């Protein structure tokens, strides 16, 4: 049936606020948009954690469930849950086949988690993944640097995804923004 691309996620910590945005497009192969309104950003752990995925949709649901289980196991400790999930993801033969990346965040910490065992905390409080991730990251950094006094975290997240959606064919303007 072809590869599905589940597109762009952007997250930012800014002036004591945090927000994560994701677009709604799911594309099969390089030619067909299958869905315009996929929800790729979710609140987890009683609304205290945000998680967003880019990659295979079915794989992402598996990873959301696994990460939420780790959050419960480690009582909401985001870093510990992310590290333990990455270890399990990398160490399990079946899980290694999953094709997705996650950004997870709470009010103080933001992490990129991948199946290669990477758990990365950005220096600047901004992360972006997916096919439009580079565009969203560049836009977000510029907005945070040059308009930081005038924009909220939610506004930076939404504007960054809008710019990515203008450039990347796998990113649309059906943007969902979640805040903590």
UniProtKB/Swiss-Prot annotation:
Keyword Hydrolase among record annotations: yes
Entry-linked Pfam families: Proteasome
One term under GO cellular component: proteasome core complex
Disulfide bonds: none
Keywords: Allosteric enzyme, Cytoplasm, Hydrolase, Metal-binding, Protease, Sodium, Threonine protease
Catalytic function, reaction form: ATP-dependent cleavage of peptide bonds with broad specificity
Activity regulation behaviour: Allosterically activated by HslU binding.
Entry's Gene Ontology molecular function annotations: metal ion binding; threonine-type endopeptidase activity
Annotated catalytic residues: 7
UniProt-listed InterPro entries: ATP-dep_Prtase_HsIV_su (IPR022281), Ntn_hydrolases_N (IPR029055), Proteasome_sua/b (IPR001353), Proteasome_suB-type (IPR023333)
UniProt subcellular location: Cytoplasm
Domain of life: Bacteria
Binding site for Na(+): 165, 168, 171
EC number(s) per entry: 3.4.25.2
GO process terms (BP): proteolysis involved in protein catabolic process
Assembly and binders: A double ring-shaped homohexamer of HslV is capped on each side by a ring-shaped HslU homohexamer. The assembly of the HslU/HslV complex is dependent on binding of ATP.
Protein task: Protease subunit of a proteasome-like degradation complex believed to be a general protein degrading machinery.
Family per record: Belongs to the peptidase T1B family. HslV subfamily.
Protein name: ATP-dependent protease subunit HslV
């Amino acid at each position: 049936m072809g590869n599905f691309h589940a597109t762009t996620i952007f997250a930012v910590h800014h002036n004591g606020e945090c927000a994560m945005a994701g677009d709604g497009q799911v594309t099969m192969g390089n030619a067909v948009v299958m869905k315009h309104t996929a929800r790729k950003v979710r609140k987890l752990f009683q609304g205290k954690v945000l998680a967003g995925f880019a990659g295979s949709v079915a794989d992402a649901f598996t990873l959301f469930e696994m990460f939420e289980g780790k959050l419960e196991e480690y009582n909401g400790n985001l870093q510990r849950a992310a590290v333990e999930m990455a270890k399990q993801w990398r160490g399990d033969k079946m899980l290694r086949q999953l094709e997705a990346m996650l950004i997870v965040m709470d009010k103080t910490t933001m992490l990129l988690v991948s199946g290669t065992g990477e758990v990365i905390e950005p220096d600047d409080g901004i992360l972006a993944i997916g096919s439009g991730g580079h565009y969203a990251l560049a836009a977000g950094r510029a907005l945070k640097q040059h308009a930081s006094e005038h924009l909220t975290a939610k506004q930076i997240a939404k504007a960054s995804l809008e710019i990515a959606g203008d450039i990347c064919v796998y990113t649309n303007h059906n943007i969902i923004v979640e805040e903590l």
